[in-house]
């Protein structure tokens, strides 16, 4: 199967299925002599781990990572880093009824159409279980970013669940780690809890929007035309399971703005570098970073596995009905937050190495950081 690798210089390949023995990744292009151990990677995996609240799948996986290669005495060696996560809580019996039936909204039919065979247990390779491997790769990417000329911070938050959006006037990054939703607003988190309890008890699911922000990225990362930084970020987010839309900066809202409103004006900063008065561009112009915060949002569709009976067909082409059993996320967007962070880190690590290889030194540091406190996009 093609399409299992991502990146150019910093490149990772993931492997494994939802109910297979293990999942993991091989990360290539990691510079030597970077500190890396399992405890560092585990910290990021624990944020994504299932079973931590009633609002996510109750599959109990410790997601304990093992470093199998590429590290010696706590430092990377410059050779491929292989990371393994053993699956420990598969319940394949829950999926016996779908061996010969295609679940609406899942990749069952498309995998069968392409390969003539599919692993029906938990979705196999198409399961969101694969994203744990990306989070592990993202941890390695963060070590690469630590060698950049200035600190690069990648943070994510859930900003919408169903019709309910966060109150950006109350945005607090510290609040993200205090609730089970990665929500930057305590009031909205409480509302989401009540809302999702109703969704969960009904056996249904709901979509969400995730926002990922990178601060401290110097001006100059990215390439023009076909290798744009925002192009790679959009592709990265679209590879995440259940993601159906991506926007950068003002994104689709830019269609409603005038040219005067949309273009980010500049003043001269004390260091002679531009000081942007807004960040509608989301930190990228012409495919190259501006030095401002890079702001990406992506929409996650509702989990397709629900208890409501749905019409479908079986492998013989007969119409039938299906109710999906198993342990599923009522809102898969919650655990997509650490995954989005990981993909942002991987793209930035790749472009950092590419920029350094091309010009020999990083670009100048711009005026990064939020334009207004609590609002990464600004206005």
From Swiss-Prot:
MF-aspect GO terms: chorismate synthase activity; FMN binding
One GO location term (cellular component): cytosol
Superkingdom to which the source organism belongs: Bacteria
Essential cofactor(s): FMNH2
Cofactor binding comment, as recorded: Reduced FMN (FMNH(2)).
Keyword tags: Amino-acid biosynthesis, Aromatic amino acid biosynthesis, FAD, Flavoprotein, FMN, Lyase, NADP
Family affiliation: Belongs to the chorismate synthase family.
Name of this protein: Chorismate synthase
Species of origin: Rhodospirillum centenum (strain ATCC 51521 / SW)
